[in-house]
Structure formats: C-alpha cells, structure tokens
Amino acid sequence: MAKEIKFSEEARRAMLRGVDKLADAVKVTLGPKGRNVVLEKKFGSPLITNDGVTIAKEIELEDPFENMGAKLVAEVASKTNDIAGDGTTTATVLAQAMIREGLKNVAAGANPMGIRRGIEKAVAVAVEELKAISKPIKGKESIAQVAAISAADEEVGQLIAEAMERVGNDGVITLEESKGFTTELDVVEGMQFDRGYVSPYMITDTEKMEAVLENPYILITDKKVSNIQELLPVLEQVVQQGRPLLIIAEDVEGEALATLVVNKLRGTFNAVAVKAPGFGDRRKAMLEDIAILTGGEVISEELGRELKSTTVASLGRASKVVVTKETTTIVEGAGDSERIKARINQIRAQLEETTSEFDREKLQERLAKLAGGVAVIKVGAATETELKERKLRIEDALNSTRAAVEEGIVAGGGTALMNVYSKVAAIEAEGDEATGVKIVLRAIEEPVRQIAQNAGLEGSIIVERLKNEKAGIGFNAATGEWVDMIEEGIVDPTKVTRSALQNAASVAAMVLTTEAVVADKPEENKGGANPGMPDMGGMM
C-alpha cells in the first residue's frame, strides 16, 4: 500500500490537531464540576462517563496524521491508568499543554533535543518534590476521603474504606453488578475458592442449601479418588476423633463417593467432598496454599505420598468450613503463622517478577486469600446506563485508594503540582534546556486552570493567586472557597499525580522530537459499479 509522508512543521502541526481534539473531549470531565461525555455504542444504550481513559480509547479520527497525535495522548491516559488506576484526565491535560507549548518553541527555531532535556530535568525535580511533600495515609477516614474525591460520592468512599479495613491492604476487592438499586458491601472472611460440593446429599442445612462443618479435618490431595479402600485408613482415624472431614481432591467418584454419601445419610459420619480449585500448575500452587493455611500436607504421588498411608497428622484443620453449590470457604485455618507469612512473601516476590497481566491477577487473588479475605462491592443503579457509569467511577476510586495506600497523598485539585512550582522554577538551565523547564512550568498550571474553567471561573486568576498562597492552601472548586486542601479531605494519591506528570512528559518529548510522520495513503474510490455493466433501467 502506498504511504503518505509529512515532514517537520507540517507533521507536528497535524499531530497537534489530533492531540487537541482528543484532549478537548477529555478535559471537560476534570474536577468536581466536570461534565460527562456520551459515547455511542454499536449495541445497547450509549455509555455516559467522566473517565478520561475510557473516552480516550473510543476516539478514532478520520485524518491518519491527526489520529496518530490522538493515539499518542490516549497512550498517556492508558499508561497512567495501568500504573496508578486513576488520574487519566490530569495526564491528558498535562500532555496537551506540554505538546502545545513545546511546538510553539520548536516552530520559533528552538532545538527539540535541548527542550527534551529541559523537560526531563524539570519533571525529575517535580517528582522528587512531590515525594517529599507526600503524606502517608492513615486510618479509615483518610481512605474514605481519597475514594470519595475520586468517585465524587461520599457513600462510595465509606464503602471502599470499610472494605479495605475488613480485608486489609492485600485483600481483594472486586466489583459486581447488583440486581437492586443500592450499592452494598459483602465481605468473605477466610479463604474462599470457587468449587462446591460434588453431591447435594452432603448438605447439612437444607434451607440454605449448604454444608457447614464445625472444627473439621481437611484432606488435601491432587489425586482422583474412586476406590474407598484407599480412603478407609484415614477415615477410620477421623471417625474415632468424632470430627467431620472435608476432602479436597481432583475428583471424588464411584465407590468412594457412594460410601461417603451413604454414611452421611445414616448419620454415621459427616464428610463433604469438593473438587480442587484451578488447573495444572496453578492447582498445585493453590492446594499448597490451602495446606499451609490449614496446617496440613498435600497428599501427592509426585511427592511420594499415598492416600492409604495417610494419618490424621497429615490433615489440615480449621474452625469452620462452609460449602455451597459453587463455593468453599475455609474460616480460621490452623496453619503456622510463620509458614503463612513466608508463603505470602514468596507470592509477593513472584508478583514483582511477573510480566503477564493474567498471572498478576491470579497471584493477587492467592495473596488476598492467604493474607486477608475478599470483599465484593455490589454496584446498584436504577438504569443500565447509570449502572455502567457508576461502576466505572467506583473502579477508579478503588484504584485511586490503592495508589494512596502505596505512596501516600498530596493536596488535590492540582494544588500539589502548584506547590512544586517554585522548586522547578529554581532549576538552573540555559538556552533550549531553560525553555524545556518553562514548558513544564506552564503545563503544571494547567490542571488548576482547567478545574476552574469547568466550574465556570477564570482559570488564570485562580492560578496567579495559588502561586502566592502558602503550601497546602488551594481552591475548592466545589464550594468556590480557598481552604487547606488536606484538612478538607481534597487529596490526590501521590502515585497518581506523579505518574500523570511522568507519562505526559514522556509522550510530549516524543512528539516534539518527531521530524517525519508516515501514514497509509487513502485509496481513491474508483466508483462502486463495474464499468462494463449494462444499463439496468428496464428491469423491474
């Protein structure tokens, strides 16, 4: 396919048009008085959102050169979302400001490489200063504030704070769509995995359709159990102890299953069998997790262990096990706390090394099950459109809160960036490098300016006053008052602000140093009909 090439100023101008189109659509959502954007969907109702990255991903421009510019800024939003989970609109606003200011200077004859060095120097200083003014997040109230600011909803803030308090910082918090109108929190204590009983005859509570085992022994094996003779020695020992038994195996079938069910129905012996969670290597790892949590051992032929020679000493224990049709929950496993801690650290080390998003998610789940528990926020709304929008906002708030726990918080509403202004302005640089520093200075004013404009105020007046205010004092666009931002609970996670600035600078530097842009040449339409076709006027 033929290509079209644009060079230097013409190329950069075309990309800037794309940058502006995307950024202008995204930045209207910034701040407490930001507006929504409606996205057309091929199927179903349109999506209403104020999430920067969701809007950015939807935008495709007709002109291929403009589209490249738009896609680069969409990359800023996407990268910030991947690292920090929020702050995508701020990142887009910063990138647009840096690109626009930078291109003005390049057009006036400045050297792009010099500007790039200046931008990198300024951003490094700004990031260091942000880390220096960052405050660690303490207590439920602070967590609730961060979440409430991100979701623009205090009720959501309280829910997320409660979820984090209940499952701990390593716990998993997931979002589900609720059947009702209200948004609620459901917390699963202990370790839960998605496998239920193999036979409904094993249930102990017919009303709830679940099997509840108090103080049971837990047999953990990766084998398929079908021969009852293999199980008999350990079953006899458990019966003598007068306690119930949970069997976690690849499968329990045939004679073994029939014997367990018959004994349960006769009231001789209470046992519940469930299939092992996961598949392949992940199954082995999860069985090992369960064994460590309950103080048992995995009975595996790979390790030279046989079922028929198993004793009670190899079984795990827990204070309670609840098995439903689809899930098994082990509460208060009797494992050694030091071994559990070592296992958690091992999973953390694997988390740091993995590059696969899927593996990361599964490791995070395993970590949560060992360390804390699982909280489910069930999102409710009156209509499907509202539900989608609300779910997106809560997802952002959740990510924002995790980022705050990780790296602390700074004053929100763009104030933190303005607080590092003087440090960046004090950088000693000359020539084009100094121009790069000035570009960053102009860009870090932009979030405050945009928040004020979205609230219907003159941005420049707010920016100038903020430069003269003492650190931490900022403009609350929701009320129109000047307040101590952190005291008022208007905060941003340091990680979000830092990532937005770094990613914006990275893409801006790429655009400024672009000298040629290559795109596919649009094919000219040579007419739809075949020129050799006869006239069809006489056809009915």
From Swiss-Prot:
Subcellular location per the Swiss-Prot or TrEMBL entry: Cytoplasm
Role according to the record: Together with its co-chaperonin GroES, plays an essential role in assisting protein folding. The GroEL-GroES system forms a nano-cage that allows encapsulation of the non-native substrate proteins and provides a physical environment optimized to promote and accelerate protein folding.
Gene3D superfamilies referenced in this protein's UniProt entry, alphabetically: GroEL, GroEL-like equatorial domain, TCP-1-like chaperonin intermediate domain
EC number: 5.6.1.7
Keywords: ATP-binding, Chaperone, Cytoplasm, Isomerase, Nucleotide-binding
Subunit structure: Forms a cylinder of 14 subunits composed of two heptameric rings stacked back-to-back. Interacts with the co-chaperonin GroES.
Name assigned to this protein: Chaperonin GroEL
Any GO molecular function: isomerase activity
CDD domains to which the protein is assigned, alphabetical: GroEL
Binding, ATP: T29, L30, G31, P32, D86, G87, T88, T89, T90, G413, N476, A477, A478, D492
